[in-house]
């Protein structure tokens, strides 16, 4: 990066993404993703697809593709049964209910980014990933408008209940994931 200030900012973000967005559990030594490992964050050690996959994952893919692959295994494994639910514990159970379209699309967008960055198309044959994508498409169909290609959400990306069911930001994520 030619700009020293920008490089410093990138490296700070990289450090956070590598060391604060994931950890190893003490009991099972399993990789888990979290909103943040920092005790200063108001929801530390919970799991949100958006935070892990739309915010941290792009940097992790650039810096450590092997870790990025393990992150996808966790998402499409441990977290798969509640994809699209607002927030979850690290074992995949629901912490705070409520459907969020951006949370549902985050695994698809992360997978697309991973394959594009690494060229690893073998991951697309993984049974857990294939099942997860099938689950996501099924959930997406149940939230589609009956006559136009818009998809409904219950919670906004701000985690507040939405005033209108069809949000532009969320539907752009659907468009990007399905193109």
Question: What role is predicted for each listed range?
Answer:
Residues 171-179:
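Active-site neighborhood of glycoside hydrolase catalytic domains
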Residues 32-41, 83-99, 150-166:
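Acidic/His metal-coordination segments adjacent to aromatic residues that form catalytic metal sites
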């Amino acid at each position: 990066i030619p700009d020293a200030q920008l490089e410093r900012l990138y490296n700070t973000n990289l450090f956070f993404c590598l060391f604060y967005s994931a950890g190893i559990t003490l009991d099972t030594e399993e990789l888990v993703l979290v909103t943040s490992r920092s005790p200063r964050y108001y929801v530390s050690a919970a799991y949100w697809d958006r935070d892990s996959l739309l915010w941290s994952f792009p940097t992790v893919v650039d810096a450590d593709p092997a870790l990025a692959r393990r992150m996808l295994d966790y998402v499409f494994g441990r977290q798969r049964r509640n994809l699209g639910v607002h927030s979850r514990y690290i074992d995949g159970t629901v912490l705070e209910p409520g459907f969020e379209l951006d949370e549902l699309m985050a695994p698809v967008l992360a997978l697309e980014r991973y394959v594009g960055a690494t060229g690893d198309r073998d991951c697309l044959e993984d049974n857990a990933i294939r099942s997860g994508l099938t689950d996501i498409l099924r959930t997406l169909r149940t939230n589609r408008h009956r006559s136009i290609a818009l998809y409904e959400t219950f919670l906004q990306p701000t985690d507040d209940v939405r005033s209108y069911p069809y949000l532009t930001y969320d539907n752009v994520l659907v468009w990007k994931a399905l193109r």
